[in-house]
């Protein structure tokens, strides 16, 4: 079952020691989309995975399998053509269905010309997370995959995005230990990106972001969404300071098929205008990176991958803004 914290704000911790790497603000722009490799069907994997849990829209190409090389090739070519420079791949645990697909994702990304990072979703071990176990888990991931040519890097360091759930499980004090020890044990260090917009996070991590702003854009008109983004995005950039600043755009949000307790924070697509307005304000805010939530989070209706209901409307809108931002 999917889950998302809608706007990541974790209370700051006084007295944290800076563990990240100081970056200047003159760095290459990126347009990165969150990617979910957890979908399976009987034709490829012998079973259904994730599709039966509920989806807001139907994929235009049908309920595909993320272990199908033809599907991944098609997705990555579409993303590349849209001006997306890389994908942030959801990561849960070693040996699961998503990790089994990682070699295919990396090989396809290299062939197409995309970068890959991971979204570290949960600290380890699951029942009682500790900084020590999380350090070991991250080092295992980095040692197996981060030397790949297509892994996203910043200042020469492999990038790892950390989701709010993982942040909350260890708190910032625990992540201080994780970052310190991983940087000590991994040659050259790592660029950690926190799913939290706060001064405390920007002091500890190498960059900050927010996975999904639907908690703030829900039930708003296009004009209200624009006003929110115009007021908020520059604050996100300012909070990052000299760290990597990110602004997140969404096409909409609808998780009402997941049987979650209501009321749900649904953001209307407004015929594609939600996405366009957020992109306009994101470019104007001049962050380092723009994040798209999402390429294919079908459970929460935030996908820009073509659907039967929305066609390729948002995907086709992406190149205009990506080119403007990346030039």
Residue ranges, per PLM feature:
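N-terminal export signals
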Residues: 5-24
């Amino acid at each position: 079952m999917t889950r998302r914290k809608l706007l990541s704000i974790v209370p700051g911790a006084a007295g944290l020691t800076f563990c990240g790497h100081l970056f200047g603000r003159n760095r290459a722009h990126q347009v990165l989309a969150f990617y979910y490799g957890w979908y399976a069907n009987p034709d490829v994997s012998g079973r259904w995975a994730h599709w039966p849990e509920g989806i807001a829209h139907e994929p235009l190409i049908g309920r595909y399998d993320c272990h199908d090389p033809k599907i991944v090739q098609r997705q990555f070519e579409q993303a590349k053509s849209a001006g997306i420079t890389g994908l942030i791949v959801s990561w849960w645990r070693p040996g699961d269905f998503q990790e089994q697909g990682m070699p295919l994702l990396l090989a396809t990304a290299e062939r197409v010309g995309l970068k890959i990072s991971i979204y570290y979703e949960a600290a380890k071990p699951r029942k009682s997370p500790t900084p020590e176990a999380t350090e070991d888990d991250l080092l295992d991931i980095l040692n197996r995959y981060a030397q790949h040519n297509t892994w996203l890097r910043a200042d020469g360091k492999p990038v790892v995005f950390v989701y709010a759930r993982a942040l909350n499980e260890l708190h910032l004090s625990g992540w201080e230990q994780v970052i310190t020890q991983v940087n000590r044990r991994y040659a050259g260090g790592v660029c950690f990106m926190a799913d939290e917009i706060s001064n405390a996070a920007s002091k500890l991590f190498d960059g900050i972001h927010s996975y999904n702003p639907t908690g703030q854009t829900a039930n708003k008109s296009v004009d209200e969404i624009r006003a929110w983004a115009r007021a908020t995005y520059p604050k996100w950039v300012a909070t990052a300071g000299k760290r990597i600043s990110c602004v997140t755009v969404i096409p909409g949000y609808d998780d009402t098929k997941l049987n979650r307790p209501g009321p749900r924070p649904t953001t209307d697509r407004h015929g594609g205008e939600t996405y366009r307005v957020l992109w306009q304000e994101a470019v104007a805010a001049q962050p380092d990176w723009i994040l798209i939530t999402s390429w294919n989070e079908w459970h929460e209706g935030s996908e820009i991958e073509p659907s039967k209901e929305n066609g390729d409307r948002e995907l086709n809108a992406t190149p205009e803004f990506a080119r403007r931002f990346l030039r």
